[in-house]
């Protein structure tokens, strides 16, 4: 693959430079390679690879039977048959071109002295599709390689483009490898441009010079992020582009022998900064909120610092264990650039897959504990991938701020301890959980949130044809009143007692709250009261719990089964909790603002 060729070229250039020896690299450009390869050459290559006659005929029929017509002034020309080239965009085309080129690569590696990779391994050419390199230790061997290559392409309908070719030819001067600045090689009588000591050429998307591969930079990332921040898009659209298109564009370029931990960390820093700008998050927002997977309670922003080394480590392991003709074990075992790169990547990837780490960070950190339960049900996280119908960009941003603990309160860590008290006068820290779940100022808003959730479940039950009582009064014989949220009468004499509650996701599992809620009614006293109210019914106690930050816990599975709650209703309840969380916080802020002491009068100037 591309990584093998890149490592090979990097290893060769740096190894020869370290030893102060001569080396020669010629980058060849094939003029319109995929458009000019002859069809007989493709047929010959397939025969050489042992492809059976039936498959040969089938493949050739897709190529040789192609034709086009040109319409000029209302008149159509005769059929113009395509005699050369392969179809652009056809997934089979690169394979056909590669097998045509394979004969040349094999011939060069067998007949030419080539470049010394290890004491037992020499390679004269590196090829990937139409990206072709010639490697030679001695400059006197390069003309023979060029002549063989030109003759091979000429007989197959292809030609080289000397203007786009480049060469690096280094001589030994005082024990050092010094690249020549004057042209040394020709193609059909025309000189190939020498690169010298400062010029570069592109190979497989990476930049190479006489010193090896160039280090990746964050220049493009900085420019892309700046344009993204200025783009007239909604916040969810910007974040989608960042995650799905922009950051993945860096993956290939960062899988380079020149990559360092510092470059990867800078990419992560820039991505986090842009994410915070998109959602108006505080600077102190924990990285676990950003880098944890969506199913683990985060936003799913890929972390380059650990993801790229993990990818590279797997690819290098596959190379080392591979069965190709190149003995990668020898290359990685001898002292040299390839070995240094191999062990550097192993060190950078020593922590392994970052996903378990960030999941544990979500679970153990005080501001994010409980969000790991987003993995229990897709409804808890689907809104992050697809914005719910009817939501505005502001709604989405506020929901993200709620999930990441960024709705403004006095209890945030940057506040001094003596200033963290609730501004409503409560003897509690003004944390987000207190504002949404406990502050008397937001009591009526919490009741509205609860009633909306109950109404959704009751509507679903009535659609099923079940008789549904909302907040029925159930008296015990000693006068004690019970008032469950829902009493749902199902067929076969079953009565489901369902109580809806919104809890804060924290260190205490929501499953514990679910059990505690069930025991409020699943006891002998309520059973006696239920018999007096409804007669001899088969009682089923199954509460419905939701997290205040939009978590649908696994504990609700029995309730979902009993009431046949669909995915759409689960998602709707989660969206209700998220929107009401924003509304409750807004009501709290408006209330404490109205109660603030008046500003002191300004002094009157004399």
Curated annotation (Swiss-Prot):
Pfam families the UniProt entry points to: RVT_1 (PF00078)
SUPFAM superfamilies linked: DNA/RNA polymerases
Alphabetical list of PROSITE patterns matching this protein: RT_POL
Residue stretches making up the Reverse transcriptase domain: 1-208
Keywords: Endonuclease, Hydrolase, Nuclease, Nucleotidyltransferase, RNA-directed DNA polymerase, Transferase, Transposable element
Top EC class, one word: transferase
GO molecular function terms noted in the UniProt entry: endonuclease activity; RNA-directed DNA polymerase activity
Annotated region (Nucleic acid-binding endonuclease), positions in chain: 331-606
Annotated EC: 2.7.7.49
Catalysed conversion reaction: DNA(n) + a 2'-deoxyribonucleoside 5'-triphosphate = DNA(n+1) + diphosphate
Keyword Cell inner membrane belongs to the record: no
Protein name in the entry: Retrovirus-related Pol polyprotein from type-1 retrotransposable element R2
Organism whose genome encodes this protein: Popillia japonica
């Amino acid at each position: 693959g591309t990584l093998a060729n890149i490592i090979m070229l990097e290893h060769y250039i740096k190894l020869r430079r370290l030893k102060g020896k001569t080396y020669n690299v010629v980058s060849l450009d094939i003029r319109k390679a995929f458009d000019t390869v002859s069809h007989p050459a493709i047929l010959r290559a397939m025969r050489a690879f042992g492809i059976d006659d039936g498959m040969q005929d089938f493949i050739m029929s897709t190529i040789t039977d192609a034709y086009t017509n040109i319409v000029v002034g209302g008149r159509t020309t005769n059929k113009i048959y395509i005699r050369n080239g392969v179809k652009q965009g056809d997934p089979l085309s690169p394979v056909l071109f590669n097998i045509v080129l394979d004969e040349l690569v094999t011939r060069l590696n067998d007949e030419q002295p080539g470049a010394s990779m290890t004491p037992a391994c020499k390679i004269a050419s590196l090829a990937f599709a139409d990206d072709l390199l010639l490697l030679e230790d001695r400059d006197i061997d390069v003309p023979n390689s060029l002549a063989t290559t030109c003759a091979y392409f000429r007989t197959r309908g292809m030609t080289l483009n000397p203007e786009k070719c480049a060469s690096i030819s280094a001589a030994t001067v005082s024990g050092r490898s010094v690249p020549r600045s004057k042209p040394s090689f020709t193609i059909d009588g025309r000189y190939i441009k020498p690169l010298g000591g400062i010029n570069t050429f592109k190979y497989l998307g990476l930049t190479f010079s006489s010193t090896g591969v160039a280090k990746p930079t964050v220049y493009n990332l900085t420019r892309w992020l700046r344009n993204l921040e200025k783009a007239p898009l909604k916040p969810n659209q910007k974040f989608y582009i960042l995650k799905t298109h922009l950051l993945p564009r860096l993956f290939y370029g960062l899988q380079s022998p020149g990559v360092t931990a510092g470059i990867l960390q800078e990419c992560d820093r820039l991505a986090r900064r842009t994410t915070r700008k998109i959602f108006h998050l505080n600077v102190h927002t924990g990285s676990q909120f950003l880098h944890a997977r969506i199913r683990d309670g985060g936003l799913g922003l890929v972390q380059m610092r650990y993801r790229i080394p993990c990818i590279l480590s797997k690819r290098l392991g596959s190379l080392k264990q591979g069965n190709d003709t190149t003995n990668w074990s020898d290359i990685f075992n001898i002292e040299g650039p390839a070995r240094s790169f191999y062990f550097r990547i192993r060190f950078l990837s020593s922590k392994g897959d970052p996903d378990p780490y960030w999941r544990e960070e979500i679970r153990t950190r005080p501001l994010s504990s409980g969000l790991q339960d987003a993995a229990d049900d897709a409804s808890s996280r689907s809104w992050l991938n697809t914005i719910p119908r009817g939501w505005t960009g502001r709604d989405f941003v506020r929901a993200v701020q709620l999930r990441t603990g960024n709705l403004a309160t006095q209890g945030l860590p940057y506040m001094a301890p003596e200033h963290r008290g609730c501004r409503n006068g409560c003897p509690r820290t003004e944390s987000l959980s207190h504002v949404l779940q406990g502050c008397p100022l937001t009591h009526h808003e919490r009741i509205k949130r609860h009633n909306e959730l109950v109404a959704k479940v009751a509507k679903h039950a009535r659609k099923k044809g079940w008789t549904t009582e909302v907040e029925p009064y159930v008296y015990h014989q000693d006068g004690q009143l019970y008032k469950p949220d829902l009493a749902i009468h199902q067929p076969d004499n079953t009565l489901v007692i369902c109580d809806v509650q919104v809890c804060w996701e924290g260190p205490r599992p929501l499953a514990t709250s679910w059990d505690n809620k069930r025991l409020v009614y699943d006891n002998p006293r309520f059973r006696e009261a239920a018999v007096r109210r409804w007669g001899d019914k088969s009682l089923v106690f199954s509460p419905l719990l939701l997290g205040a930050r939009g978590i649908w816990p696994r504990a609700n599975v029995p309730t979902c089964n009993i009431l046949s709650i669909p995915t759409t209703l689960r998602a709707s309840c989660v969206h209700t909790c998220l929107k009401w969380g924003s509304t409750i916080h807004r009501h709290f802020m408006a209330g404490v603002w109205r109660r603030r002491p008046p500003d002191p009068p300004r002094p009157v100037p004399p």
